[in-house]
Amino acid sequence: DPEMSRGLGDVYKRQGHGWLINQFLSPMFNKRTDEYGGDLTNRMRFALEIIENVRQKCGPDFILGYRLSADERVTGGLTIEDTKAIVPYLDQAGVDYFSISIAVNATDDQMIPSMYYRHGYQADYAKEVKDVTCKPVITVGRINDTRIAESILRSHKADLIGFARQSLTDPETPNKAREGRFEDIRKCVGCLHGCVGHIDTGLAGSCELNPLVGHESDPEYQTVPAEHPKKVMVVGAGPAGMQAAIAAAECGHQVE
């Protein structure tokens, strides 16, 4: 099949947030009157057929992950109680792990949280899902501090933590945490400007706090040691000033 022929060892079905399979599951979207609509058993049919087909073609060792909107946070949509009824069927059909988020496009402020949401605010939904499956459960949602992530894991609300925007802001987050360099971690501030904001308007994704995003292999953005190091004074402590200080120091200049 296509995935296996490309040498992949897993596939991740992102089917929350109003995407196709989610539309079949959700009573808000699904108005069909055939065997794929109506009660929960019928609304699950499409998802289960896809999972069973992938499992049949890719074999038992192929890892299959599944993203769910545990609660669509909209009137008439899926609730966490619906999801707790659905997950055991997906589990039995062959899903290896679940990635739990919330919301759909109509409630996208909760789906892609800004700085006004508390860190790890979706973890309680992951805990609800963990109660009905033995498979690993991932939580997401404004988690930009590895110590917060660790507290979620220790409280058994999730088995794994998903860093999305935080991985853009500082790809070295896990390594710095492993080395105990917590204060060196550059944290996503949840501004939604360079990442979601740019992509939604057709621009290339970026990050307000990490200018290398999208330019990782661009020679103009690479650090080159200065032939004649100088003393450099940076006036201003905003993102631009801080990055200027970092770049100058990495080039070997003495920054004040």
Label the predicted regions:
Residues 21-46, 75-81, 108-120:
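Glycine-rich tight-turn/loop motif centered on a GG-T
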Residues 157-176:
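Glycine-rich phosphate-binding active-site loops on the catalytic face of alpha/beta enzymes
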